[in-house]
Amino acid sequence: MQTHFIITSPLEQFEIVTIFPFSISGLNFSLTNSSLFLIIAVFLLLFWTSLSFYSNTLIPNNWQLVKESIYEITASMVQDNLGSKGEFYFPFIFTLHLLLLYCNLIGMIPYSFTVTSHIVFTFGLALSIFIGINLIGIQTHGFKFFALFLPRGVPLAIVPLLITIEFLSYIVKVFTLSIRLFANMTSGHTLLKIIAGFAWTMLSAGGLLAIFHLIPLALLLALTGLELAIAGLQAYVFTLLTCIYLNDVLDMH
């Protein structure tokens, strides 16, 4: 585990470090910085949800307005994409939205860890959602669900080719869903570290360069605000695409 205060490499912030080693029968169940911050995000989600139920007032304060805004955004997303049938899936979609939002925002805290910056997490989450959505489709439509891969009126000669193309375009959703979140969070945090390192180098050099370090520092502050917006946007986009994919399965699009 790195003990120095200044991170020397822009990619060092993504290193998974074992905090508490633990294994059973050769299986590794160690607590890492990634799992630790994921647990923190889950506890924050539970805490936020409990406040939503028990700390409301007739005249909403600023904190209550934030809670209600996130709820309304998610509810509107579900209503626009799933309609009335989305009410059954709202608890899952709302939880997913909040979890990703907290994971992204926690990663903006200096010397924390961005769980969503690792493709292992985003791909695992996207694959789990994809499997669940397909199970819902099979449960809802039975074997008719597989008609998704064969549109009506297709000539028999091109059926094998079309099924292959439709199947590949269907499973690629897992990769687009996971890579989009992973790539945006990784690239944004890397850029922030590079600019922060550049500002620190200029300040350490002293003299005239120490004065001009305010330029990259101002740029860093501006990009930090932009990255905060991206953190919220990527959580929204991931959840929105989940709603769209779920609707495609329910309506056989």
Curated annotation (Swiss-Prot):
Segments crossing the lipid bilayer: 34-54, 89-109, 118-138, 156-178, 203-223, 226-246
Organism domain of life: Eukaryota
Primary location recorded for the protein, binned into one broad class: mitochondrion
Membrane association type: Multi-pass membrane protein
Molecular functions (GO terms): proton-transporting ATP synthase activity, rotational mechanism
Gene3D superfamilies, per database record: ATP synthase, F0 complex, subunit A
Compartments it resides in: Mitochondrion inner membrane
Disulfide bonds: none
Keyword list, A-Z: ATP synthesis, CF(0), Hydrogen ion transport, Ion transport, Membrane, Mitochondrion, Mitochondrion inner membrane, Transmembrane, Transmembrane helix, Transport
Gene Ontology CC annotation, any one: mitochondrial inner membrane
Matches recorded under CDD domains: ATP-synt_Fo_a_6
Role description: Mitochondrial membrane ATP synthase (F(1)F(0) ATP synthase or Complex V) produces ATP from ADP in the presence of a proton gradient across the membrane which is generated by electron transport complexes of the respiratory chain. F-type ATPases consist of two structural domains, F(1) - containing the extramembraneous catalytic core and F(0) - containing the membrane proton channel, linked together by a central stalk and a peripheral stalk. During catalysis, ATP synthesis in the catalytic domain of F(1) is coupled via a rotary mechanism of the central stalk subunits to proton translocation.
Recorded family membership: Belongs to the ATPase A chain family.
Subunit structure: F-type ATPases have 2 components, CF(1) - the catalytic core - and CF(0) - the membrane proton channel. CF(1) has five subunits: alpha(3), beta(3), gamma(1), delta(1), epsilon(1). CF(0) has three main subunits: a, b and c.
HAMAP family: ATP_synth_a_bact
Listed name of the protein: ATP synthase subunit a
Biological source species: Chondrus crispus (Carrageen Irish moss)
Upper lineage: Eukaryota, Rhodophyta, Florideophyceae, Rhodymeniophycidae, Gigartinales
